[in-house]
């Protein structure tokens, strides 16, 4: 990932951590002024050569959320304009840097803002399908794209405004007035994707298993609290570390399949047990 900032003006910054404040200019593209240029390259350690993606003129463009195909023959990039209201999912040949003929694979526009924050993720049991995350219905959700089934890239209106176009058959995996925060991984045995979401409450973070075929979701672990979750390599278990207003801290090993026993690793004592505590309520 190469960034050329030679054309960007210097912006004066003051370093106050030195004994006497010093001036340390920083590259900052002010609104309406020239921005940096980016190029994405693939370095081959065997040949010691770099092939750059032939993405065209990099002026006022951002290349984000870079990911590989499972066979390592292709590179996927979400390209964003400087206004950050037009996103394109594109694929390139990893050996030549040439773009795929049916690029873009997905296109999303909005009058104000699009926010692609996650690279695509292929299903470990089916490399012809991948998951794309989008906020096109107003909340960040998962969309399953099938590369075996091409469709005419017709423009569709999005629920949150703007529009989108798809080159592959696409199915929305999750939906609702809540946010998918991130993908932890997969349980290949149950064919489920393990996610963190705000479905229980916007003030919480909970783990869920989502069946890729049906879209059905299953809560993993305790419903209450803010959960920090680590997924095992197999995807069969999580280490769930969580707290709430009434739970000081619990750490548990929880099966993601919904079957089996939860094992408690830690049940912390309440350090405020001897105090008369007020009733805590939170509103939005």
Region locations from a protein language model:
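Extended catalytic-interface subdomain
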Residues: 1-10, 24-26, 31-48
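Non-catalytic accessory segments flanking enzyme active sites
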Residues: 1-2, 7-10, 37-39, 53, ...
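Short loop/turn segments that connect beta-strands within beta-propeller blades
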Residues: 44-48, 94-97, 147-148, 211-215, ...
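Cysteine-rich, disulfide-stabilized extracellular repeat modules
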Residues: 101, 126, 138, 166-169, ...
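Beta-strand C-termini and the immediately following turn/loop, strongest in propeller blades
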Residues: 1-4, 30-34, 69-70, 76-83, ...
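Carboxylate/His-rich catalytic cores and anion/metal-binding grooves
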Residues: 16-26, 33-37, 82-100
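Intrinsic disorder/low-complexity segments
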Residues: 153-163
């Amino acid at each position: 990932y190469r960034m050329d900032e030679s054309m960007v003006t210097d912006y004066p910054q003051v370093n106050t951590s030195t004994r006497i404040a010093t001036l340390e200019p920083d590259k900052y593209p002010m609104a309406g002024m020239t921005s940096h240029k980016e190029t994405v390259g693939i370095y081959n350690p065997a040949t010691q050569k770099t092939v750059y993606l032939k993405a065209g003129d990099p002026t006022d463009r951002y290349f984000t959320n870079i990911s590989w195909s499972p066979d390592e023959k292709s590179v996927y990039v979400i390209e964003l304009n400087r206004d950050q209201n037009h996103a394109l999912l594109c694929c390139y040949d990893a050996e030549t840097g040439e773009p795929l003929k049916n690029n873009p694979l997905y296109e999303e526009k909005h009058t104000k803002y699009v926010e692609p924050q996650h690279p695509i993720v292929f299903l470990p049991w089916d490399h012809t399908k991948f998951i794309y995350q989008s906020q096109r219905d107003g909340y960040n959700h998962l969309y399953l794209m099938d590369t075996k089934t091409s469709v005419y890239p017709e423009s569709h209106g999005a629920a949150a405004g703007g529009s989108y176009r798809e080159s592959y058959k696409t199915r929305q995996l999750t939906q609702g007035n809540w946010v998918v925060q991130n993908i932890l991984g997969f349980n290949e045995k149950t064919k489920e994707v393990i996610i963190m979401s705000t479905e229980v409450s916007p003030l919480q973070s909970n783990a869920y298993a989502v069946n890729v075929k049906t879209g059905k979701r299953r809560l993993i672990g305790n419903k209450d609290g803010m959960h920090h979750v680590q997924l095992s390599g197999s995807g069969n278990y999580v280490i769930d570390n969580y707290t709430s207003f009434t739970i000081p801290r619990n750490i548990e090993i929880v099966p993601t399949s919904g079957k089996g026993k939860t094992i408690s690793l830690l049940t912390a004592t309440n350090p405020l047990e001897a105090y008369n505590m007020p009733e805590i309520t939170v509103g939005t």
